[in-house]
UniProtKB/Swiss-Prot annotation:
A cellular-component GO term for this protein: small ribosomal subunit
Function per UniProt: One of the primary rRNA binding proteins, it binds directly to 16S rRNA where it nucleates assembly of the head domain of the 30S subunit. Is located at the subunit interface close to the decoding center, probably blocks exit of the E-site tRNA.
Keyword Lipid metabolism in annotation: no
Complexes and interactors: Part of the 30S ribosomal subunit. Contacts proteins S9 and S11.
Gene3D superfamilies on file: Ribosomal protein S7 domain
Annotated PROSITE patterns: RIBOSOMAL_S7
GO process terms (BP): translation
Single GO term (MF): tRNA binding
Protein name: Small ribosomal subunit protein uS7
């Protein structure tokens, strides 16, 4: 338990183009070394590609793909009497979103397309269609939690 006062959660402003907080958060996660304008151009370019390929609203597709990546359960290490158990726990709603965004960006960087816009657009489309590396990561995390279900009583 923290001994200091609880740190207030900072309010995030919506992005200028879509006026959406999810897009603004994703820009902040995508940003490297404080270069926000570059992160914005990458994400907006990727969302333009997504809008062209799906003939649908880009933000709606992005939110659906993030929903397909969000994990419901994860495992946490818990030490009990000299041995460490992987204990399955539910993921808090804010952590679900942040994990989904991190996985989306991580697995889009590993793709083979040429530019980051194309990589990110490809991963968003794959997640929208419930396939791709980020969705596989979620499935692996769920499998791990299901395999360690016997240790669920060590939850704290």
């Amino acid at each position: 338990m923290p001994r200091r006062r609880e740190v207030p959660k900072r309010n995030i402003l919506p992005d200028p183009k879509f006026h959406d907080k999810t897009v603004a958060k994703l820009i902040n996660v995508l940003m490297l070394a404080g270069k926000k304008s570059i992160a914005e151009s990458i994400l907006y370019g990727a969302l333009d590609i997504v809008a062209q390929k799906t003939n649908d609203e880009a933000v709606k597709v992005l939110k659906k793909s993030l929903d397909n990546i969000k994990p419901a359960l994860e495992v946490k290490s818990r030490r009990v009497g000299g041995s460490t158990y992987q204990v399955p726990i539910e993921v808090r709603p804010d952590r679900r979103v942040s994990l989904a965004m991190r996985w989306l960006i991580k697995y889009s960087t590993l793709r083979s397309e040429k530019t980051m816009k194309d990589k990110l657009a490809g991963e968003i489309l794959d997640a929208y269609n419930s396939r791709g590396a980020a969705v596989k990561k979620r499935e692996d995390v769920h499998k791990m939690a299901e395999a360690n279900r016997a240790f669920a009583h060590y939850r704290w």
